[in-house]
Design a protein with these regions (language model features):
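Flexible, solvent-exposed short loops/turns enriched in glycine
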Residues: 3-4, 166-201
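Short, charged cytosolic
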Residues: 8-33
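Juxtamembrane "helix exit" motif at the C-terminal ends of alpha-helical transmembrane segments
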Residues: 56-80
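Transmembrane alpha-helices and immediately adjacent membrane-cytoplasm interface residues
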Residues: 66, 70, 90-124
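Perimembrane loop-to-helix junctions flanking transmembrane segments
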Residues: 73-94
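Canonical alpha-helical transmembrane segment with a positive-inside/aromatic-interface signature
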Residues: 115-158, 173-180
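Cytosol-/stroma-facing membrane-proximal "stalk/adaptor" domains immediately downstream
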Residues: 184-237
Length: 237
């Protein structure tokens, strides 16, 4: 069963993450936040496309079998394997009927769509890589502003965004961060974190990513004497 965002970390791992963020922010004015979501979008078009393809495929199989059996019966052959014709496709094609195939597609479409909606991971094969990447990035940007992570004094907040369905990690820095740290650096950490999550090292890989973020932030944004903790340290859901 697919793990949910609310169940990704154990209570102990949640505590370790909070401690890791506090430690990472000890020597920097930068702020680290982490957010986990079940998915970045509902991907309704994948439900539609997937249901259409699957219903069409299975309807084709059923119609082909039905047409071939009709051909066997009309020719007076037996129904056993001994009666299997070498001209299977031609026999089936001659007896296939569009007027039964299309209604069958229509009837099967809705059960398949319901099935895909209940098991979101089935949507992934019907999505392009670009669609997934852009969606996760846009959801991360939206979350950054929805959760008001941009409201740090020196614009030094970063968001570690994890989208479980897509198996994607996106690290987003505020304007102050991006002025000094290249986005490629965050991409490397995101890739390492994604690999750790795939290996089911959830808490450990997140804590390691937070630590690396803190080290880089401390080099460019040393802690100020009047610095305060501006963002919550708990995992955002």
């Amino acid at each position: 069963m697919k793990i949910k965002a609310s169940e990704l970390f154990s209570p102990e791992e949640n505590k370790d993450i909070v401690d890791s963020i506090k430690k990472a922010e000890t020597n920097t004015s930068g702020e680290v936040a982490i957010m986990v979501v079940d998915s970045s979008d509902s991907y309704r078009e994948a439900e539609t496309l997937g249901a259409f393809i699957l219903s069409g495929f299975f309807s084709l199989i059923l119609e082909t079998v039905k047409a071939y059996l009709t051909a066997l019966k009309a020719a007076g052959w037996g129904y056993g394997l001994s009666g299997f014709s070498a001209h299977f496709l031609s026999e089936a094609a001659a007896n296939a009927a569009v007027w039964t195939y299309i209604p069958m597609v229509f009837v099967l479409y809705f059960p398949f769509r319901f099935l895909i909606s209940k098991f979101p991971e089935m949507k992934i094969p019907f999505l392009s890589g670009n669609r997934i990447e852009e969606t996760v990035r846009e959801r991360a940007v939206m979350a950054f502003y929805e959760k008001q992570l941009y409201k740090t004094r020196d614009e030094t907040g970063i968001l570690i965004f994890i989208s479980l369905l897509e198996h994607r990690v996106w690290i987003l820095g505020d304007r102050g961060i991006n002025a000094k740290i290249a986005p490629d650096f965050w991409g490397i950490i995101a890739s390492e974190l994604s690999s750790g999550i795939k290996e089911k090292q959830y808490g450990k890989s997140v804590c390691l990513a937070i630590s690396k973020c803190g080290e880089e932030l401390s080099r460019h944004f040393p802690k100020k004497s009047d610095d305060t903790n501006e963002l919550a340290d708990e995992v955002i859901l």
